[in-house]
A protein has these predicted regions:
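Short glycine/proline- and acidic residue-enriched helix-loop micro-motifs
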Residues: 96-101, 242-248, 362-363
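Membrane-embedded alpha-helical bundles of multi-pass enzymes
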Residues: 2-222, 422, 433, 448-459, ...
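Membrane-interface segments at or immediately adjacent to transmembrane helices
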Residues: 162-166, 212-296
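Solvent-exposed soluble domains appended to multi-pass membrane proteins
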Residues: 255-258, 276-478
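Residue-level signal for pocket-adjacent positions within structured domains
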Residues: 75, 142, 147, 152, ...
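Short acidic/polar capping segments at secondary-structure boundaries
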Residues: 136, 141, 177, 242-243, ...
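Generic structural signal for well-ordered alpha-helices
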Residues: 113, 260-264, 377
Length: 478
């Protein structure tokens, strides 16, 4: 019965319409494997389906892979349209094509992996079970590092496995998210060989390797690769819930400061983190009295405060997207700063200013020409802890966080996800923070403007999370 059904499906997939429809539907289902749905088990099945469909049409394998991931990335990253059209007001005449532009570029990397895979000889077991997972992992690494102008690791297979009950997440602490990506691709490949291989010996071998991959992940999940040091410390992540359209309105500056001041006064946590650009003015332009009031409020409560704020460079010619600590007279006499290193192209710097200047005017985007901070910046000293900060989507670059994390005892992300409204972007970024916490074996404090503000454990699990679109303070002990 199974063989007859399999044969009928094989004939059906040879009809171009049904083949293309199957590719599109499977690709469109990939967002379900990621946050906020966390159906991690889906991704090996979906990727395995792509492998089998690609094998059915070897002459069109590269095109099939490209179209699959064009649909997949467009589905996963539809929040690009949310940011440009719904929040920034860009007309759909421009917003829709631009939404598909990045997926169209990103899909070139999977297509290249399948193009190389097609050229490999040898047995099917070798090509599917060994070569393809290796090529896929290299393509994902290249996509993170070598996208023209910037890297972009969102949507990597490995992130789909950063979930509480996923066994494959166990590979993250030993070799990072790329190891999880390899394990996911390998599991998918060997599942294909298990289901679609003749001979019981070959199927038994495939079953053993599937069990080995899953079993190794389960074992690694039980291991502790870091140890707690020192005493527990209380932390707080502040969520202001400031609408993006009002954030840089000068008439809203004082109400914004008052809101954050009231929230800071509520907490007695030792470490308090505010979101990216929580203070909307340049640091040097803020009235000194305002900064003093925040520092004094934190000091009265036994807190040390880190705030997201734009700041001019020392020469005053450029500006930074920064997190600064507000000094107090007892514990933190000097101001410390972390400046964002990975800037968002077209959002925080202008790769092609002659072409993109009209676009910025249409989208009414403030602060779109930041200067990069340096690489491997030192952690900030707060309440006896060394806190390695990253800003916005920087927590998607795990390789860049290794050096700062080695010097740190805590990780912290300060973000403003109001650009993406209620889309899945905030949840996908939270999943990346979970990956970084798991890789580095450290707690992650996430302070965002509207969500998802959360505390993540060294095991990559969400300890506590604040409701989205509500102003408040999320407290925990780490």
């Amino acid at each position: 019965m199974f063989s007859r059904l399999h044969a009928r499906l094989e004939r059906l997939w040879h009809i171009p319409f049904f083949y293309a429809l199957a590719l599109a539907l499977i690709a469109a289902a990939t967002p379900l494997a990621f946050a906020p749905y966390y159906h991690f088990w889906l991704m090996p099945l979906l990727f395995g389906a792509l492998i089998r469909l690609a094998e059915l049409k070897p002459k069109h394998m590269v095109l099939s892979a490209y179209l699959f991931w064009l649909v997949a990335y467009s589905s996963q990253f539809w929040w690009i349209h949310t940011a440009m059209h719904d929040v920034s007001g860009l007309d759909n005449v421009f917003a829709v094509p631009l939404t598909f532009l990045m997926p169209a570029v990103l899909a070139l990397y999977p297509a290249l992996a399948f193009a190389l895979w097609r050229r490999f000889g040898g047995s099917r077991t070798l090509r599917v079970g060994v070569v393809l997972p290796m090529l896929w992992t290299l393509a994902e690494f290249a996509r993170e590092q070598l996208v023209p102008g910037f890297g972009f690791g969102w949507g990597a297979l490995g992130y789909s496995q950063i979930a509480e009950y996923s066994p494959l997440a166990g590979f993250a602490p030993i070799a990072g998210i790329h190891a999880v990506t390899w394990a996911t691709a390998a599991l998918a490949a060997w599942l294909v060989l298990l289901v679609d291989t003749e001979g019981w010996k070959e199927r038994a071998k495939a079953a053993c390797i599937v069990a080995l991959i899953v079993g190794a992940g389960c074992f690694l999940r039980t291991q502790e690769f870091t140890q707690n040091t020192g005493r527990p410390v209380s932390v707080a992540a502040v969520q202001g819930n400031i609408e993006q359209q009002l954030k840089f309105d000068e008439s809203r500056y004082l109400p914004t400061y008052q809101l954050y001041y009231d929230l800071v006064k509520q907490t007695h946590a030792q470490i308090v983190v505010l979101p990216e650009t929580a203070f909307p003015q340049f640091l040097q332009n803020i009235e000194p009295e305002i900064l003093t009031q925040f520092a004094q409020a934190a000091e009265r409560n036994g807190s040390e405060l880190a705030v997201g704020v734009p700041a001019f460079t020392e020469d005053g010619r450029n500006y930074l997207n920064a997190v600064v600590t507000l000094p107090n007279t007892q514990k933190q006499p000097a101001q410390q700063m972390y400046a964002k290193n990975h800037l968002v192209p077209f959002g925080e710097y202008k790769p092609l200013p002659v072409i993109t200047k009209p676009l910025y005017q249409l989208m009414n985007m403030p602060l779109a020409d930041f200067q990069r901070g340096g690489a491997n910046q030192a952690p900030l000293n707060m309440a006896g802890e060394k806190v390695a900060f990253n800003i916005c989507y920087e927590d998607g670059f795990g390789d860049d966080l290794i050096a700062p994390a080695k010097q740190s005892t805590l990780l912290a992300n300060s973000s403003n996800m109001a650009w993406f409204a209620d889309s899945n972007a905030m949840w996908q970024q939270l999943q990346q923070s979970q990956a970084r916490a798991l890789e580095m074996g450290r707690y992650m404090i996430r302070a965002t403007n509207r969500g998802a503000t959360a505390i993540v454990s060294p095991q990559g699990n969400i300890v506590s999370i604040a409701p989205s679109d509500v102003a408040g303070v999320l407290e925990s002990t780490v």
